[in-house]
Regions:
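Ser/Thr-rich low-complexity repeats and stalk/linker segments
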Residues: 76-78, 88-157
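Short, well-ordered beta-strand segments enriched in hydrophobic/aromatic residues
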Residues: 80-84
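Solvent-exposed, non-transmembrane segments of extracytoplasmic/periplasmic domains
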Residues: 1-79, 97, 142-143, 147-152
Length: 157
């Protein structure tokens, strides 16, 4: 892996799959305050083949927002949710279209103190509704609607 990339978290998923989240700073597009942030989630099969790598670049968070969410999957393997969240967000939940609520683990990094990273892999057949960020006290701070992402994914898979 490129030496500028920082591994944020890694783990395993069913079927012998492994995953990792990485991030790195990249030169900005001429902004005076410098760098942009790229973050990705990579899913690897037991033979070491990359099944999926997705995420995004740009500013760590857009002005006025507390979350930047990306989702996706490849032709095989689970569906991935990766979010960059403001440090005020202490807990993240994923809600399915059926109303089931799942905890999305949140990971910090000393290298990227302006954001934390939340990620979860779920079965690709699952229909999702939203990702919600909460304060330490449980107050809902921001909700990201997944309807567009899900409609596109399930129509084109």
């Amino acid at each position: 892996m490129d030496e500028r990339r920082v591994v944020i978290a890694e783990g395993t998923y069913g079927g012998g799959l492994s995953w990792l989240i990485w991030a790195m700073r990249a030169p900005g597009s001429g902004s005076p305050d410098g760098d942009e942030l790229m973050s990705m989630i990579r899913i690897i099969d037991p033979d070491g083949r990359i099944l999926h790598e997705g995420g995004g670049g740009g500013p760590a968070l857009y002005p006025g927002t507390l979350m930047k969410v990306s989702t996706g999957a490849s032709d095989e393997g689970p569906y991935a949710i990766l979010a960059r969240v403001h440090p005020d967000i202490r807990r993240v939940e994923l809600t399915t279209a059926d109303g089931e609520i799942m905890n999305v683990p949140v990971y910090g990094s000393a290298d990227f103190q302006e954001v934390r990273f939340a990620a979860l892999l779920v079965p690709r057949e699952l229909h999702l509704d939203s990702v919600t960020g909460f304060s330490e006290g449980g107050e809902e701070l921001e909700r990201f609607d997944l309807a567009f992402h899900q409609r596109f994914f399930h129509q084109h898979r």
